[in-house]
Design a protein with these regions (language model features):
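Helix-loop "lid/cap" segments that line or gate small-molecule binding pockets
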Residues: 294-295, 346
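Gly/Pro-rich cap/lid or specificity-loop segments adjacent to the active site
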Residues: 17-287, 342-344, 348-507
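Structural motif
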Residues: 272-291, 297-301, 331-338
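Bacterial N-terminal signal peptides
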Residues: 2-13
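Short, solvent-exposed helix-helix connector turns and helix-capping sites enriched
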Residues: 243, 312-320
C-alpha cells in the first residue's frame, strides 16, 4: 500500500492528465493498444459559442516506465493526409523515440477522423474514365456541393475555417489537453509548413522541431512544384546520360520522352495495373506527366522511369502506369481534397496568378518547366476560382527567427520540396537551424536509417547546442539507385545432383 502511494506521487501531473484525456483504443495496422482522445474546438474561432468540430488524436504511450515529459507530435503532409492513418507506417520509424516519449498523431481539421473533407478517390479509377482538367474541375464542383451539407458545416463558406493557422491552434489545444508543457514536432512536406506556423504562434511551447521536406509558408505549390518536378526529371535524364550502363540500355531516353509527349493525345490500350484488365482510353499529356511525377518522389521508383519511358515511347504503357500506381497505393496516401483546396486556395491562391508564368508548353517542351506548371496551374487556378477562401494573416508568410533548435532535412532529388526551399527557411530561422541535405534522396527522408538516427539524436539531445551539433556525415553514404534493368531471360538452371549426392540427401 505504501509503495503504491509513493509510486502515485512520483507520476508527473502531465502523465496523469494525459491518461484522463484519453481512453484505450485500437488503430488499424497498429498491433498493440493505444489511447485515443478528442478535443472540441469552435469551427469558427471568432464564434466560440457556434458550431464545434471534433479534433481526434491518438497517443502511443512510451515503452519505458521512466518516460520523458515532452511528447513527439507528427504533422502529416498533403495538405490533406490523416496523421492517424499514417501511424502504422510511421511508428516503426519512431521506435527509438517511442522508448521514452509518447508519440502523438493528430488528425488536422478536415482530415481522417476530424470532419474529413474528402472528395471521391479517383486514384484507382478505370483508365477509360475522363482524367483531364475539365473532368477534375467538375468533380471538385460536385464535391464542394456535397461538403457544404456535411455537419458541422452550415454552408460552403464554412470551408474557410480549415487554414493552417486555425489548425495549429487546434494542435495547441491537444497539447494543453494532454498537459504537456513543451512538445517536439516532426513535420513532413506540408507538415513542415504547419510546424513553422506552430513555432510562430507558440514558440514557448516548442522544444525541438524536425522539418522533413521543407515547404515554406510563402511557397506557391503549383508553381514551385512544376519547376522542381521538371528539375528532378532533368536530373534523372542527365544521370542516365552520364551512366554507362543506363546510356547503353537507353541511348535515346531524352528523345523518347520528347517524342512521347509530342505524340499525345492518342487512343491506346493497356492493362490496368491493379485489375489486369485491358482497357481502351485516350492517353493525354496530363496523364503522362502525372504518371512520371509520382515515381520521382522515390528514387527507388524513379530508377524504373528510363525503362518505362522507353517502353511507352514504343507503345507499351503498362510499366509507366504501374510505377505511378505503386506510389498512389501506399498506406496513408489518401488526401482529403476538400481540406487540400481549403488550405492551398487560401494560402497559395492569392499568389498563384502573380507567380504563374504565361504561355503554353507545347507538345515537346520537356526542357522547360511549362508542362508541369500548366498541369497543376490550370487545375488550381480554376478550382480556387470557386472554392471558398479563408483569411490568412500577413505574418503567416514570414518565418521568424527560431526560439528552439530546428533540424531541416532535404533530398537532393526531391521533385516537391528540394533543398532550395530549406536554404531560405534556414536563413530565416537563424542560429537555431541545422540543415542537412541527402544528395541522393527524394521526398521524405525518415525512411532512411541514417536519417532516423539523426532525428532521434537531435530530439534526444540534452540541450539545443548538442542537438545542433549532431554528426550527419552518414548521409553522404546514401547511394542513388541505379536505373532498373529488366532480366534478359531466365537464369541458367542449376545442375542436377549426381545419383550418389541424391542418395546422401535422401539419408
Amino acid at each position: 500500500m505504501a509503495f503504491a502511494v509513493v509510486a502515485a506521487l512520483w507520476i508527473p501531473a502531465s502523465w496523469a492528465q494525459s491518461a484522463e484525456a484519453t481512453a484505450p483504443c485500437r488503430v488499424p495496422g497498429v498491433a498493440h493498444e493505444v489511447r485515443c482522445g478528442v478535443v472540441h474546438r469552435p469551427l469558427d474561432p471568432a464564434q466560440p459559442g457556434g458550431p464545434a468540430i471534433d479534433i481526434h488524436f491518438v497517443v502511443v504511450p512510451a515503452v519505458a516506465r521512466r518516460r520523458l515529459p515532452d511528447p513527439v507530435f507528427l504533422l502529416a503532409g498533403g495538405p490533406g493526409q490523416s496523421a492517424i492513418a499514417l501511424a502504422p507506417a510511421v511508428l516503426p520509424l519512431f521506435a527509438r523515440l517511442n522508448n521514452r516519449r509518447d508519440i502523438v498523431f493528430v488528425d488536422q481539421r478536415g482530415t481522417g477522423r476530424s470532419t474529413p473533407l474528402e472528395c471521391d478517390d479517383r486514384r484507382h479509377a478505370s483508365l477509360s474514365e475522363p482524367a483531364g482538367i475539365d473532368a477534375q474541375v467538375a468533380q471538385l464542383r460536385a464535391c464542394l456541393t456535397r461538403l457544404a451539407a456535411t455537419a458541422p458545416l452550415r454552408a460552403a463558406d464554412d470551408l474557410r475555417f480549415f487554414t493552417t493557422t486555425i489548425a495549429m491552434q487546434d494542435l495547441d489545444a491537444v497539447r494543453a489537453r494532454l498537459g504537456a508543457e513543451r512538445i517536439n514536432l516532426v513535420g513532413a512536406s506540408y507538415g513542415t509548413r504547419a510546424a513553422l506556423e506552430y513555432a510562430r504562434l507558440f514558440p514557448q511551447r516548442l522544444r525541438r522541431s524536425v522539418l522533413d521536406g521543407v515547404a515554406p509558408p510563402d511557397m506557391v505549390l503549383p508553381v514551385s512544384g512544376g519547376i522542381d518536378t521538371q528539375a528532378a526529371l532533368d536530373a534523372m535524364l542527365v544521370d542516365c546520360e552520364r551512366s554507362p550502363v543506363c546510356q547503353r540500355s537507353h541511348p535515346m531516353l531524352r528523345a523518347d520522352w520528347q517524342s512521347l509527349l509530342a505524340s499525345l493525345p492518342k487512343p491506346v490500350s493497356a492493362l490496368h495495373p491493379l485489375t489486369g484488365q485491358r482497357e481502351h482510353f485516350t492517353l493525354d499529356a496530363e496523364r503522362v506527366l502525372a504518371a512520371v511525377r509520382g515515381p520521382l518522389y522515390a528514387p527507388s521508383l524513379a530508377a524504373g522511369l528510363p525503362q518505362a519511358i522507353g517502353e511507352a515511347a514504343r507503345g507499351r504503357y503498362e510499366p509507366l502506369l504501374g510505377l505511378a500506381e505503386a506510389l498512389a497505393s501506399r498506406r496513408g496516401g489518401t488526401v482529403a481534397m476538400g481540406m487540400h483546396l481549403s488550405v492551398l486556395c487560401a494560402e497559395d491562391g492569392p499568389r498563384l496568378e502573380r507567380d504563374l508564368p504565361t504561355g503554353s508548353s507545347g507538345a515537346g517542351g520537356a526542357s522547360t518547366p511549362a508542362p508541369f506548371i500548366d498541369l497543376a496551374g490550370q487545375l488550381y487556378r480554376r478550382a480556387c476560382a470557386f472554392w471558398p477562401r479563408g483569411s490568412v494573416p500577413e505574418a503567416f508568410y514570414v518565418v521568424p527567427p527560431a526560439a528552439s533548435a530546428t533540424l531541416l532535412l532535404s533530398g537532393g532529388l526531391d521533385p516537391a520540396t528540394p533543398p532550395r526551399h530549406a536554404d531560405r527557411v534556414a536563413r530565416a530561422l537563424g542560429a537555431q537551424a541545422r540543415q542537412v541535405t541527402v544528395a541522393n534522396a527524394g521526398h521524405g527522408l525518415m525512411g532512411i536509417g541514417c536519417v532516423r538516427d539523426l532525428m532521434f539524436r537531435f530530439i534526444d539531445a540534452a540541450d539545443d547546442a548538442h542537438a545542433l551539433g549532431i554528426d550527419a556525415t552518414c548521409v553522404a553514404q546514401v547511394p542513388r539507385p541505379p536505373a532498373f534493368e529488366p532480366m534478359k531471360g531466365l537464369p541458367p538452371a542449376l545442375p542436377k545432383p549426381s545419383a550418389s549426392r541424391a542418395e546422401e540427401d535422401a539419408r
